[in-house]
Swiss-Prot record:
NCBIfam families: rplX_A_E. InterPro entries: KOW, Rib_uL2_dom2, Ribosomal_uL24_CS, Ribosomal_uL24_euk/arc, Ribosomal_uL24_KOW, Translation_prot_SH3-like_sf. Pfam families: KOW, Ribosomal_L26. The gene is rpl24. It comes from Thermococcus kodakarensis (strain ATCC BAA-918 / JCM 12380 / KOD1) (Pyrococcus kodakaraensis (strain KOD1)). Keywords: Ribonucleoprotein, Ribosomal protein, RNA-binding, rRNA-binding. This is Large ribosomal subunit protein uL24. Part of the 50S ribosomal subunit. The keyword rRNA-binding applies. It comes from the Archaea. GO terms for cellular component: cytosolic large ribosomal subunit.
Length: 121
């Protein structure tokens, strides 16, 4: 999704005030080379159930399934990407979708398959 304005101030304002139907598109991540060749699509919005690989940060190289997609904060939670709180409980570490790569798609939804076919054409 391309932002028309050049000023960083206005880009930040757009992301902060974006409606939920656009936030889903903003929460896109690139596909692995194998998936890219198979489906002919470069990136897709992340969904719960997708298997992703962390490409940046302290958890680089970790693979896991997406447990939650937080559209309000632009973050995702992945199995195996956790940290401990001071009381010892494990909580998911929030990741930005630009820092992960989709390794396996969750294709339980038939609409998603149609979206992929439409975008590949």
């Amino acid at each position: 999704m391309k932002l028309d304005m050049k000023q960083p101030r206005k880009q930040r304002k757009f992301l902060y005030n974006a409606p939920l139907h656009l936030r889903g598109k903003i929460m896109s991540a690139p596909l692995s080379k194998e998936l890219r060749e198979k489906y002919g699509v470069r990136n897709l919005p992340i969904r719960v159930g997708d298997k992703v690989k962390v490409m940046r940060g302290d958890f680089k190289g970790v693979e896991g399934k997406v447990v939650e997609v937080d559209l309000r904060r632009y973050r995702i939670h992945v199995e195996g990407v956790t940290h401990k709180k001071t009381d010892g409980t494990e909580v998911f570490y929030p990741l930005h979708p630009s820092n992960v790569m989709i390794v396996e798609l969750n294709l339980e939804d038939e609409k998603r398959e149609k979206i992929i076919e439409r975008r590949a054409a």
